A protein has these predicted regions:
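Ribonuclease/tRNase effector modules and their secretory precursors
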Residues: 1-108
Length: 108
């Protein structure tokens, strides 16, 4: 696994916050249909071991973050932005092999 030194992950363990989640209902339905993942379950990812980094791949007009964490024993990647007292979920997908290896390496 090659690591990108410009890519910085912050490790969180069982984050306890007052943040809830919000999302676009149509996008939630599409992700549930196409990937079998429900945006409504994002809180479970944040409640467990997870890594979060700023998503600075481009200028989005808002702060975005990428979080990798476990959901029902599988590694999930979320893209989200803070909106008031909620995390607005933008996307949710299963991690690829490179992300899985990086996650396991950082846990070990």
């Amino acid at each position: 696994v090659q690591e990108n030194p410009a890519l910085t992950w912050v490790f969180f363990v069982y984050t306890k916050t007052r943040y809830g989640s919000s999302f676009d209902p149509a996008k939630r339905t599409k992700t549930l249909t196409e990937r079998g993942l429900d945006f409504a379950d994002a809180g479970h990812v944040f409640a467990g071991f997870h890594f979060t980094r700023a998503d600075d791949r481009r200028v989005y007009g808002e702060r975005r973050y990428v979080t990798a964490g476990l959901l029902r024993g599988r590694l999930i990647v979320l893209v989200w932005t803070p909106r008031g007292t909620a995390r607005r979920i933008i996307s949710m997908r299963h991690a690829n092999d490179r992300e899985k290896a990086l996650f396991e390496k950082n846990l070990g």
